[in-house]
Amino acid sequence: SFSPCHMSRDLRVALFKQRHPPPLHHEDKEYEDEHDELGDLPSFGAGSTSPARAPASFTPLSSDDCFATALEIDILCTPNTHATIRAYYTPPRGESNTVVVCHHGAGFGALSYALMARDVSALSQGELGILAYDCRGHGRSTFPSHIVKDMSLASLTSDMIAVLQTLFPASDARPSIILLGHSMGGAVAVETAHALERQNDIRVTGVVMIDIVEETSLELLPSMSRIVRQRPEGFVSVASAIQWHVKTRTI
């Protein structure tokens, strides 16, 4: 099976080198539910109003060519309770059988990985599959009302394991997994890696954490109510929502 250790140096550099993605092509057809261009908006703002740089356009980009398919995965979130996970997946091609599984940060969604997914697939020439999903309380995943507010690390980890075991049932064809998490998702990725190691179930070949800032997050907790109150109640368009989030440096 494919291992990151076997990739050429040039490919490793290309995968992790910072670069500006090219503009996406806009498609006329709808992609699943109303394009799924952005998922849910982030749940907090940073409060600053001066942008680092003004982009030429705030027009939303299409995610049409970023993943091969959109999925709805039915999981057991408790022994007697089902939930539906919205996921986006591009399977690995050829002899490779490794999938990068992405968990987003708090207030974000699976499609925050859309451009990265497209580029990783292209740069690895399809050797790496990529899966991203909306965790509970985010995006288009649906959980029962008495379950969805439980955002504990244990519950998020249990959800991630359930997604993996459901989508990749035990067999010789089960892929090896690279777990990738941004912010809150980084903690989930690490905890999931430990849990899978104890279970000796799914093979994890790597863990990637992006922007892990627990100390800063804890320091901001007393100010979070003020930050949330500064958010607009709504936006007249997706473009205006993007503009506000960029100018306040939320994204």
Regions found by a protein language model. Name each.
Residues 10, 228, 239-251:
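Alpha/beta-hydrolase
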Residues 2-75, 88:
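An N-terminal hydrophobic leader/cap segment in hydrolases
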Residues 83-143:
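Conserved HGGG/HGGXW glycine-rich cap/lid loop of the alpha/beta-hydrolase fold
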Residues 127, 174, 202-204:
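Core-facing hydrophobic residues within beta-strands of well-ordered domains
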Residues 190-194, 198-239:
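Flexible "cap/lid" loop of the alpha/beta hydrolase fold
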